[in-house]
Amino acid sequence: VSDQVRHILAMNNVDEILFGNAFATEEEFKQVADVMKEVYVHVDKVTQFGEMISNILPHGDLKRLPLGIELAEGVTDTEKEILHYGSHQVSEYIHYMIRSRWTRLFYKNADIPCRDCGKEYFEKGDVLIVNNNLSFYKAEIQICMKPMKNTGQRNLLGHISKDALCILDLIHKGDIFTITE
């Protein structure tokens, strides 16, 4: 049910969700409520980077798409903190990845050593963080859209569930999302 609600929200053209054909269980209503708690949030304006940056950072009352992740083994506490940074904004949507660059501004001094995940190629739905080996982009969160060679510049944080992969195709530049476990 939670992936279905995320999919409906990603379509960005639904005002109301009705359940029919059978009674929803308490667990299903709880799943819907948990997703909806992540959707509408208020984010204060960040001023530490100057007026120009503070005006383009997402702030105010926001609607964001919560994406569920199956966390990979070995993710560090620093990587988890960056991953769960409140609201990611799609800065670029290129054919092979979704990029959320604001975390690299807030976490530019973080230490993110390279971790081997044992994969030669990342696949659609893999959630990545740029590590110390690509310092200019370090701490940027990326979501793979197509197979991409693992060059040692990104660490695997986890994977969007198979049932929710279709949601990624509905995300566009400027959309705001958050990562949940």
Regions found by a protein language model. Give the residues of each.
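C-terminal functional modules
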Residues: 53-181
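Catalytic alpha/beta core domains of metabolic enzymes, predominantly
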Residues: 1-67, 76
